[in-house]
Amino acid sequence: MTKIVAAFPCMGKSHYAKENPDTTIDLESSLYMFSRKGFEHLSVEEFKGIREREPIKNGMVHYLKTILETCHTGQYDYVFIASFPNLLKSLAQLGKDVYVVIPYPSMRSQRIYSKRAIARGNRPQWVEAVIPWLHHSTAYPKELINKIHVVRVPACFYLKDVIDHQLI
């Protein structure tokens, strides 16, 4: 059965999917949510955080539909997705099991994930906007927390570690 896995940025979703293409796909949300017109020369990571990105009409609907269709094929063991609360809520309302992997909130996590983001090419503005979410214990509404599987992990973990340790 295909597992839907949302994970905090920089946990190795793309890397794991590239290393395990027969079992895993990473559905990068920015490819569904924003037009790349004028930004084709940028990597996906560089593209994140650009304020001038043009939203794609119904991008979230298309992204959700792609997630559901990909799971329905049964081709993959893991479908990696973004961790937007509204997306997770929609999947939970549709009765889908969703695993959300988040590092324990700490200054160590903040340092590690900031360093990972910069190393992979994320813009500083993106890092400044995302990293503080490590410390938000209320990032997801209580009613959503009861419908998803939240997996907290040490700062040093990547998704490979989570899967190898059978935490999802």
Predicted features and spans:
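Conserved substrate/cofactor phosphate-moiety recognition/catalytic segment
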Residues: 18-70, 113
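Loop/turn-to-beta-strand initiation segments
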Residues: 74-80
